[in-house]
Amino acid sequence: MIKMRVRFPTLVLLLGIVFLMAVSIGIAYGEKNVIKNHERPQEREQEERDPRQQPRPHHQEEQEREHRREEERDREPSRGRRESEESREEEREQRREPRREREQEQQPQHGRREEEEEWQPRRQRPQSRREEREQEQGSSSSSRRQSAYERREQREEREQEQEQGSRSDSRRQRNPYYFSSERFQTLYRNRNGQIRVLERFDKRTDRLENLQNYRIVEFQSKPNTLILPKHSDADYILVVLNGSATITIVNPDKRQSYNLENGDALRLPAGTTSYILNPDDNQNLRVVKLAIPINNPGNFYDFYPSSSKDQQSYFSGFSRNTLEATFNTRYEEIQRILLGNEDEQEDDEQRHGQEQSHQDEGVIVRVSKEQVQELRKYAQSSSRKGKPSKSGPFNLRSNKPIYSNKFGNFYEITPNRNPQAQDLDISLTFIEINEGALLLPHYNSKAIFVVLVDEGEGNYELVGIRDQQRQQDEQEVRRYSARLSEGDIFVIPAGHPISINASSNFRLLGFGINADENQRNFLAGFEDNVIRQLDREVKGLTFPGFAEDVERLIKNQQQSYFANAQPQQQQQREREGRHGRRGHIFSILSTLY
């Protein structure tokens, strides 16, 4: 046990000596490799290029190791100098490393700083623009009004672009006062014509709630056709917009027929049985009616005595016993003659072939020329001069226009001038605007106008309030506009300023509702201009400019009611442009000749 204790320290000492020798040998071998690599770089590169070289034998490696030791002993005097140089080089390298680390740490910061400097102007640009805009807005009250107006113009232009690119549903939400011709719903249609009705006004917006009991109906028929007799639970005011017609009104004690031409109008009381003939051989008939339902607001029904594929006879709603007692005839006979019998014999079909074909056609049927002549034999023409009668038709252009100049004509029949429209409180207007002309801005004091495009194309601008539920000081003005074409309809609420621009010869038909004592107030023009009638002092207090400047501006427009839609400045620029081009051409010709 004592011997083991003595040998253990000795063993540890020997192991330490061996470890130190191994370390010294490894260091010497590493330095030898460094020297060898400096002296023989070509051999090293060759070894790296050929990694597939076979490993050398162990005794050969031992010989090479001995050879290296001998060379190291031969170079022993210069080894100290080399080690000192290497130590100095290591010190220099140690001093360089902290500097490199600092540079590497600073390099990303410089990159980020450069990126921040690069992005900083971009962030500052909007801020500088806002500051400049605020400075410009703060320069004067007029510039503030102008910038607010420009912002509103830009917003409304974006809304109009979205309106033109969107579908009809989204467009309806932005402009509830405009109804395209696609908003009509077809009631009846066959090869001879069609009857359709516009959707309800109050379904579009609450702002048209007062129009819930008014509907627009349109029917068209081909030449030599007849719309079968019917009556309705609504009052009608009908207007012929295209072609000619013969309408027959049937009362319990008499029957009256009238020949109607383009522009003729007629009141058709509720419950009156009537039928309309298109007697022309070539021209289609187009009639528009304003319907005022009696029983249910916004809903009306047509009642036909005949049965066809489109509707049933109102006789079919009675019981068999009631019909037999009413006509004092067997039910089978009533069914065969009035209602139609599906079990008719073949000889009966041949005998009544014409009546059967009319049932197959529907509501609008064809008639022969002989039948046309018979139906028009006792018809009267409309009254084109003098006061309208209490029951007969009247023409919208029978009297002189109330507004007229070289740019357009404005015809109107008011309730106090027409007994047929007096109890309905309806007025009728017919407007003709020449191509390139403008109906100057105006508003109606109490009447709501429903306007239909009869012919041509144009556009309108209606000024309203964006949110009518806000307080007065928070209300914001909005412009509602739309491109108009034939068949389109738009509504002009009372008090809302409007202007209409014609891009082609434009014809409009208007129904004025709540029209009694309505007054039309123009906002520009020489006559009937309410702005012109303001006191001079009030003009200066109302507008940003001085009173004399306001008066001079108002007097610039010498026309009344209708004017040229092209601004005077633009016309002058175009004239100058044409004159400039002409002078340029003359100068070129003068150099040539």
UniProtKB/Swiss-Prot annotation:
Residues 1-30 form the signal peptide. InterPro entries: Cupin_1, RmlC-like_jellyroll, RmlC_Cupin_sf, Seed_Storage-Functional. CDD domains: cupin_7S_vicilin-like_C, cupin_7S_vicilin-like_N. SUPFAM superfamilies: RmlC-like cupins (SSF51182). This is Conglutin beta 6. It comes from Lupinus angustifolius. One of its GO terms (molecular function) is nutrient reservoir activity. The variability of the residues taking part of IgE-binding epitopes might be responsible of the difference in cross-reactivity among legumes.
